[in-house]
Amino acid sequence: MKVSQILPLAGAISVASGFWIPDFSNKQNSNSYPGQYKGKGGYQDDCGDDYKKGYKSKTYSKVKPITSTDCTTPIQPTGTTTGYTKDVVESTSYTTDTAYTTTVITVTKCDGGSCSHTAVTTGVTIITVTTNDVITEYTTYCPLTSTPATESTPATESTPATESTPATESTPATESTPATESTPCTTSTETTPATESTPATESTPATESTPATESTPATESTPATESTPATESTPATESTPCTTSTETTPATESTASTETASSTPVESTVIVPSTTVITVSSCYEDKCSVSSVTTGVVTISSEETIYTTYCPITSSITIPVPNTSTPAAPGTPVESQPVIPGTETTPAAPGTPVESQPVIPGTETTPAAPGTPVESQPATTPVAPGTETTPAAPGTPVESQPATTPVAPGTETTPAAPGTPVESQPVIPGTETTPAAPGTPVESQPATTPVAPGTETTPAAPGTPVESQPVIPGTETTPAAPGTPVESQPATTPVAPGTETTPAAPGTPVESQPVIPGTETTPAAPGTPGTEATPVTTQPVSVLSTSQVVTASGEFSTVTAHSTSIVASCPEGGCVPEGQQTETSPSVPTNGPEVEASSSVLSIPVSSVTTSTIASSSETSVPPAQVSTFEGSGSALKKPYYGLAVAALVYFM
């Protein structure tokens, strides 16, 4: 590094660290004094006096009783001395604490249009603060204890003159209640000290200057305990009155009925405040509770008596904040992704509007948490005979819209509970529909996919607006919790007989998206506004999704599948286990009819399996078969015999 680069860097470091090269020259600068040097600790002159850093003028924080100081400083090693004179301006800011005396004040309390006057003997502490030739007197009235000679509670926390707000905090006797104190602690009487400020040029009383004849109810029972001499008066938030239910009215100087001056020591000393733990007794309706409070301690010692004042610690005030639990954001629409049949869907948290998409048969959908208003739309599918419809619970305003599908004979319809308008949606015969709980408005949107018989659909939880999309047959739907007004709109998809449809929980708008079989879908967390997805109109798939490998050869195609489903249907060509149905392009068509038969067996279209088509059956070169994997939980368990059965079936077809 070059020298030209080192010097500026060193200079910057020196300035930043506050290090100054001592100046021992005899030249007098504008911001320094003869023989004075600057260091990290502040200023120090030749007389050995240390001053705070930052006082560069002739005014020092130290108070000098004299106006000039002569000192000699050896400047050269030869012993020559040079005399200098420094001007020290006496500080005009100081605080004087007078001795502790007693007086009798009158405390006026008003409640319900009646006022009561109580004479209380209190201690008086007068603090005189002089700031820039402005004299301010603070008179603090503190409750006395039964043993004033040993312990009392005057408020005498003094603030240095440099602070704009003198500390004059008074804590009621209840905050310093020793075991031997006879502090009045009743529901009708409260000894609340009044802090008063009487400056020479301006008078700023404590938090409230309330004369004896005027009563100001204190809503929080906080006595006036801190006074600012200038134009502000800051009440002490830590003051704990004896009685929590009584009103506090600070008394001003005019409320003193009699003033008894006791022996006043000539001198008093204020010791630096410390902290201690005292026991505070709070009484309400003849019941008292004891709590420990950490307070500041100011000890005033005189010739004969030591007065200890317990003052609140303002620097460590802890304001209790009500617990704010952050529940799942209610009213947030949640968009559920489709669930594969045989899948258990966990709905979004309660209070979240969920958009229900159609559920594939065999799927069990759990609705969103309760508390969301649900809007039920009428089902447009006729109800098969023998269907039992249960209307919404009573007390729930339901907007009934006409069902566009006739109800099959033999259907038992249960009307809504009294006082609850219910809109009945047609249910396919054999279907048991349970309406949303009372008090929850449910808006059901028509399901675009028919629900297979024996399907039970579980709607979103109550309190969440649920928009029901079509449910695939075989699905069990559980409605949302009651208490939400339900607006039933007709469902556009017929419900298969034997299907039990449970409406969405009241109050939770849930829009369910179609669920693919075999998939367990967890809906998006509540509180996230989601778009309303349009239900998929895919044909219901009654098989569990599995991973399938289709191998094409010159003569036949082999399908290896792993599935945990049970054979549910047997087409003309034979029984195919659920989860093995595949829509295949003819991979190795040996002849046209076989290919058609092979594809006709798989009536359920599966878009995730694709194979390459060979132009003619005579070609021997077969391209590698494409392998596609279904998204589902069925691929976890591998059972080879299912694959062999499917392969044999395809081979014979």
Curated annotation (Swiss-Prot):
Lipidated sites in chain (GPI-anchor amidated glycine): 632
Described function: Cell wall protein which mediates cell-cell and cell-substrate adhesion. Required for biofilm formation and plays a role in virulence.
Biased composition (Low complexity): 145-267, 341-353, 361-538
Region of interest (10 X 20 AA approximate tandem repeats), ranges: 326-541
Description of post-translational modifications: The GPI-anchor is attached to the protein in the endoplasmic reticulum and serves to target the protein to the cell surface. There, the glucosamine-inositol phospholipid moiety is cleaved off and the GPI-modified mannoprotein is covalently attached via its lipidless GPI glycan remnant to the 1,6-beta-glucan of the outer cell wall layer.
Protein name per its UniProtKB record: Cell wall adhesin EAP1
Polar residues compositional bias, start-end: 579-590
Record localization: Secreted, Cell wall; Membrane
Listed GO CC annotations: extracellular region; fungal-type cell wall; side of membrane
Chain intervals for the UniProt region annotation (N-terminal cell-cell adhesion domain): 19-146
